Amino acid sequence: MSAVASILSIILFLAFLTSGIQKVLFNPLASQSAGHLGFSKSAFQRIGMVEIAGAVAVMAGLAAKGTSFWAILNELAAGGLTVTMILAVYFHVRKGDDVKVFAPAAGLAVLALLELIFRLA
C-alpha cells in the first residue's frame, strides 16, 4: 500500500469517526440535518454507526497487504464509505441544497474513492 493510501486512510478514519459520533449522539447539528433530510432520529443514528464502523474498518486494514482479511476489509470499507457519501450528496441535491451544504460529503466521497484506488494500485 502506498503512503498516499495510508494518509487517506487516516484522514478517512478521523473524518468518519467524528461525523459518526455526532450522528449517534444526535447533537443539535445532526438533529437539524436529520430533520431537513427527512430522516428519523434512529435512522440518522444508524447512519452514524455505519460511518463509525467504516472508519474503524478502514483503520484496521491500514497496514494489511495483499488479499488478507484486513486488506479486503479496508477495501470494502472504503467502497462502502464512498457509496454512503454519494447517497448523502443525492439526498442534499434532492432537497435543493446549495453546493456548500453537500460539498463536505462530496469531498469525503472523493477521498474514500481515492483511498480505494491507491489501495488497489
PLM regions: where:
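Membrane-interface extramembranous regions
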Residues: 1-121
